Amino acid sequence: MNTSRFILALLISLFITAPINAQSIREQDIRAELGFLASDAMQGRGSGTIYERIAAEYIGSQFQQFGLEPGGDTDSAGNKSFVQRVPVQTAPSGATWNTIGILRGSDPGEAIMLSAHLDHLGVNEAAPGDDKIFNGADDDASGSVAVIELARGLAAGKKPRRTIYFVCFGSEERGGLGSRQFIDNPPVPLTQIVADLQFEMLGRPDAKVAAGTLWLTGFERSSLGPELARHGAALVADPHPEQHFFQRSDNYPLALRGVIAHTVSSYGLHTDYHRASDDVSKIDFPFMTRSINSLVKPVQWLANSYFRPAWLPGQAPTPRPTR
């Protein structure tokens, strides 16, 4: 066993969390999962590093425990993995990694997607102060944990009508390399994905919205947000339109390809963004647990309904013209 494989196996064996109660989304599981992904041992999950791969494998191990179908690479023996290797020549390890789990629905022609990015900024020896590890607890270990826990909750229910893809992308911090690979080589035609909810920075409440509320980027662009809110989701419009968050996560390249794709967040512009101080100690776990739980029934409705969201007139994103 080479060093990289040994580190991967050791860390996952130390931190893997068993689904003690697979039907409920509990704070203790969220603490364990986020505590692993944002631990110093994970060295900031730098894009394209062995630690990003460990994060991908860990998330895949959770998906496996919930009974999801693997949607990643197939090895020479024909065995399917939850992890998808994406060659990247400029990455430290020569690749980045996505994790894909599938909850198969009864209608093979339609799917929804729940996604996040699993990487962060790694280690920066030039950073001021003693802490050089950018743990990325909020950005975006919190989003990855939301995907894990929604997989837990949804897999424990009845088989949905629409297939649900649970996807954690690698190298978002390096320009969305993982999501680009997914879009260019999707496991299902993009026309069959009726909606994607990307989860980004859900670890702390945003004081600009009501208590217990999450916000949706591009809320005014499509019929998805209002309809989810009508079915119980505590979702409101992004209170920071000047930040252009709709265009700043992995939802955007999907949206440019026609998928109704938005980001769910509660980021209140805290000062730990992209700093070594984005640590587990700053996470509001009761808020995060309530937030994830609040989305289970609305997502179940979306997975079982015949509602197909659409861009509102004049609101579909279009690529910027090249000069």
Give, region by region, the residue ranges found by the protein language model.
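Second-shell loop/turn segments in exported
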Residues: 40-50, 87-89, 99, 128-140, ...
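Metal-dependent peptidase/peptidase-like ectodomains
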Residues: 109, 159, 169-263, 267-272, ...
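Alpha-helical metal-binding/catalytic segments enriched in His/Glu/Asp
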Residues: 101, 114-120, 124-175, 295
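A non-catalytic alpha/beta surface segment that caps or lines the substrate-entry region
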Residues: 45-103
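Acidic/His- and Gly-rich active-site-bordering loop/insert found
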Residues: 37, 63, 90-127
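Extracytoplasmic/secreted proteins, especially bacterial periplasmic and envelope-associated proteins
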Residues: 25, 29-32, 36, 50-65, ...
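Bacterial N-terminal signal peptides
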Residues: 7-18
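His/Asp/Glu-rich mid-to-C-terminal helical/loop segments that flank catalytic regions of hydrolases
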Residues: 271-323
